[in-house]
Amino acid sequence: MLVINSCRAASRLALRSLNLRSPIATRTFSTGLALKTKDVVNITFVRANGDKIKTSGKVGDSLLDVVVNNNVDLDGFGACEGTLTCSTCHLIFKTSDFEKLPDKPGDEELDMLDLAYELTDTSRLGCQITLSKDMEGLEVHVPSTINDARAA
């Protein structure tokens, strides 16, 4: 019992001497997460009929994540949940935006895009596009027909 009481007393003394304003304490209690205002990108999805859906996503999320996380009403979009097996997250980019995308499509994505309706030279799968801060204000077009390549 004496040992327990002396441990408690030592703990209290250590807590009293802890300076919560010290850099070490600040780092210890910091989450390490970026501020929301710095890691959010505004995006507009344009339906084939011209209707615009404005939403936002976190830097590092895919365009598929943005649709799912914000409950964007795009019927059938992302049926395979980003496993590169369906082409339902087919999106069409403006040429200027397409050229700025950091990664070029891989063979698997190109194979899926071959099965997509309304394919263009600036088509990509939303599950393969990762948001970055320089995509702020991005506007992407959703084809009028969504094709699930798994049904082919």
From Swiss-Prot:
Essential cofactor(s): [2Fe-2S] cluster
Keyword terms, alphabetized: 2Fe-2S, Electron transport, Iron, Iron-sulfur, Lipid metabolism, Metal-binding, Mitochondrion, Steroid metabolism, Steroidogenesis, Transit peptide, Transport
Gene3D superfamilies xref list: 3.10.20.30
Transmembrane segments: none
GO BP: electron transport chain; P450-containing electron transport chain; positive regulation of ecdysteroid biosynthetic process; steroid biosynthetic process
Phenotype upon gene inactivation: RNAi-mediated knockdown results in larval growth defects, strong larval lethality and strong reduction of ecdysteroid peak level required to proceed to pupal stage. RNAi-mediated knockdown in the prothoracic gland results in larval growth defects and lethality at the third larval stage, with a complete lack of pupariation.
One MF annotation (Gene Ontology) recorded for this entry: metal ion binding
Highest taxon in the source lineage: Eukaryota
KW Electron transport (keyword) present: yes
Main localization category: mitochondrion
Transit peptide: 1-29
Residue ranges of every copy of the 2Fe-2S ferredoxin-type domain listed in the record: 41-146
Mitochondrion keyword on record: yes
Pfam (any one): Fer2
Cellular component annotations (GO), alphabetically ordered: mitochondrial matrix; mitochondrion
Localization per Swiss-Prot or TrEMBL: Mitochondrion
Function description: Required for ecdysteroidogenesis in the prothoracic gland which is necessary for larval to pupal transition.
Protein name: Adrenodoxin-like protein 2, mitochondrial
Organism this protein belongs to: Drosophila melanogaster (Fruit fly)
